[in-house]
Amino acid sequence: LQIEGRLKQSFSDGLETVKIINVETIYSNYDKPNKTIFSTYAMIHFLSQNISSKQATAIGLLAVALWSFVISLIRSLSLHMGAVGGAAMMYTLSTVLIWLIFGRPHLRNYNRGYLLWASIFFVGCELCLSLSVGFAQNARQTVEIGMVNYLWPTFTILGAVCFNGQPAKWWIGIGFVLSFFGIATVLGGDGGLSLSGIYHNVRTNPVGYLMALADALFWAAYCTLTARVKAEGSSVGFFFMLVSLLLWAEYFIGGTHSLNFDAESVGYALAAASCMGLGYAVWNIGISRGNMTVLAGASYFIPVFSALVSSFVISAPLSVQFWQGAGMVCAGSVVCWLATRRKSI
């Protein structure tokens, strides 16, 4: 590999340069599948140090594509390993992947107050996301729950305005209202924006929908806190480890669904973990060296991309009213984003 020569000099984990002396020895000790994995990790580090801003932006956009698969893959995995067991397996594999890419988290860089609250917000977010999707009763409900989760961009922007002093135009309220009307349209089912339709739909699985809403709030709180304290580096690996431990504890204490390790189950677990872990890796490259404005704008369309993926992967039947609501959610997020921009576009 041409990359091996560069690895002799530096091997960046996104936080610091880690010196490696015997790269050839490490590489030669791997079997063929692990050599491929090693090369993938090495390429990510190599790209993070040797690309232009436009290339970094393009790589960061891959995260949008990867994260669009997460909802449908979590659902598919839960059908094979159960909601709790499947989530535990996914986050365990994601933890390993993130630690290999970013290295061991350096918790000394953070104050204890930040670690405490960030852990609560991040872990709460990931638990609510995985379990709300895992306990969905059907494919359509999976996509609806995922759409409620995608209120997080709107909540994040509002958090930045209310708690971090982010200046905003008055019409940010229009974006907020538009997003909620979009969710109401989605939850109304085939009847569109209807209170009776929303009530009938939500009462079939109130816990799932409430967990999805809590997920959006937790993630917005985590982003707002991290931006407020201006935390440097990446503590995601530590938070993913906490999520994994809690899920395994829940599984062994009260789990009733046995883990199925057939080829299909393992495939879904690896795919879900890869989309989650590699998504963070390429997003880190994008936001550190690319155009953050482009990446932020693209991320607001993840709800539509995710719904498109779900309609094929888990065969979710999606009506015209659903797409109208999804479009309103995206439009509301974009309006909120534009209302906080300091320069016109």
Locations of the language-model features?
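Transmembrane alpha-helical segments that form core, pore/gating elements
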Residues: 64-75, 95-98, 156-162, 193-255
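Specific alpha-helical transmembrane segments that line the substrate/conduction pathway
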Residues: 85-96, 131-164, 292-311
